[in-house]
């Protein structure tokens, strides 16, 4: 089967898109993917069974709302035209579209008229995301407009997927789509993220010369509330002089600069190290060298209702115990015996949790094992089968 796919992201950097494309290739399907083009990338490229068609646009992080609107609109127009051209050549059975933005699903108008079924993959819930980023009211014109686009997009799609049950339930409060929406989680890829026994030897409280390593990877964004995390780290160092933190990833340039300035002003540059983003294949080895995963979030309407950080799931899959901001979505999957929660605005509580886990290696081991068991029903092989079933049902219907 040949499948068309559209995403406003880079390939293969978007992990969810990459995993789905590779899953399709594994069963012999061919994918024509339309996406963004970064500097130095080829306009067209074949990666396995994935034909990548990159449009001459880049994503600019940290821009204002008007900048995002202009970027999304430009991508929509180019993707609409590119997908139409590809459709006349291949006549797809299914076309899958990933949000953001929601209205990107309408790039499939031509293939849908010609008989293709449309699968909309909702990575995020846009109205609440804009509330989180821009502080808009749920009674504002902008919020209502975003809800309108969401409702129109979900009504237009033949089937809908989303990333966790909390975001699904929120969609259902304002969209009558229970008959066509399913959850396919961002479960870690077991080819890379697999528990194989203890990684770094857990340092005891008596071995002060051995570093106790905290680890974080992924985007560095304001809504992840690194200020509290760094303050908590600084407090914990009073009890753990050997404490270290490695942060891998990129993010909003202005915010990243603020975070690095805070580290420099507190003379922590030797203890908190920033690294460039690395390919997903390299992340597991870095996790194995860590003693504790760090997952900070700022609790707001978006994060608390729908956000389940993929990095946390990757730490769980690798058997790395984690400290995480207490947010509703994470608590709906894990309890306090599986993840060490702290109030999102309490560096004191974070520091207390870090010190407690440092002093109790057996507690870290028990927490990691319980988290692995808790997430077993959501592992990728199960999600992959669900993804295949959705596509097969679309073809048969």
Predicted segments, located by residue:
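Conserved acidic donor-binding segment of nucleotide-sugar-dependent glycosyltransferases
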Residues: 336-347, 356-362
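A short, well-ordered alpha-helix in the C-terminal region of glycosyltransferases
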Residues: 349, 356, 363-377, 389
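Acidic anion/phosphate-binding donor-loop and adjacent secondary structure
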Residues: 172-173, 178, 188-205, 210, ...
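Nucleotide-activated donor-binding/catalytic signature segment of Leloir-type glycosyltransferases, i.e.
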Residues: 257-284
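Conserved donor-binding/catalytic core segment of Leloir-type glycosyltransferases
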Residues: 206-233, 246
């Amino acid at each position: 089967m040949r499948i068309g796919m559209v995403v406003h992201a880079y390939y293969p950097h978007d992990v969810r898109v990459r995993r789905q494309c590779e899953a399709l290739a594994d069963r012999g399907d061919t994918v024509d993917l339309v996406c963004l083009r970064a500097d130095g990338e080829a306009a067209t490229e074949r990666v396995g069974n994935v034909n990548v068609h990159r449009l001459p646009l880049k994503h600019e992080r940290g821009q204002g709302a008007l900048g995002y609107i202009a970027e999304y609109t430009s991508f929509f127009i180019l993707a609409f035209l590119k997908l139409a051209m590809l459709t006349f050549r291949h006549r797809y059975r299914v076309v899958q579209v990933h949000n953001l933005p929601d209205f990107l699903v309408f790039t499939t108008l031509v293939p849908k008229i010609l008989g293709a079924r449309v699968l909309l993959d909702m990575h995020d819930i846009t109205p609440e995301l804009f509330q989180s980023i821009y502080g808009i009211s749920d009674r504002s014109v902008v919020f209502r407009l975003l809800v309108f686009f969401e409702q129109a997009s979900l009504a237009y799609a033949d089937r809908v997927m989303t990333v966790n049950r909390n975001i699904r339930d929120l969609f259902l409060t304002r969209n009558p789509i229970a008959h066509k929406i399913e959850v396919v989680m961002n479960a870690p890829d077991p080819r890379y993220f697999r528990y194989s026994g203890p990684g770094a030897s857990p340092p005891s409280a008596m071995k002060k010369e051995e570093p106790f390593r905290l680890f974080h990877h992924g985007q560095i964004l304001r809504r992840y509330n690194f200020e509290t995390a760094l303050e908590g780290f600084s407090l914990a160092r009073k009890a753990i002089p050997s404490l270290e933190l490695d942060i891998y990833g990129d993010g909003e340039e202005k915010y990243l600069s603020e975070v690095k300035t805070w580290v420099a002003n507190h003379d922590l540059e030797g203890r908190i190290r920033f690294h460039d983003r690395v390919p997903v294949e390299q992340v597991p080895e870095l996790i194995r060298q860590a003693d504790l995963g760090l997952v900070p979030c700022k609790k707001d309407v978006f994060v608390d209702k729908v956000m389940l950080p993929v990095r946390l799931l990757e730490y769980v899959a690798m058997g790395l115990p984690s400290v995480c901001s207490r947010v509703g979505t994470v608590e709906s999957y894990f309890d306090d015996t599986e993840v060490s929660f702290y109030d999102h605005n309490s560096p004191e509580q974070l520091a207390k949790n870090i010190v407690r886990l440092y002093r109790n290696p057996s507690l870290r081991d028990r927490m990691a094992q319980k988290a692995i068991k808790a997430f077993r029903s959501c592992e990728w092989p199960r999600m992959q089968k669900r993804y295949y079933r959705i596509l097969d049902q679309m073809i048969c219907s």
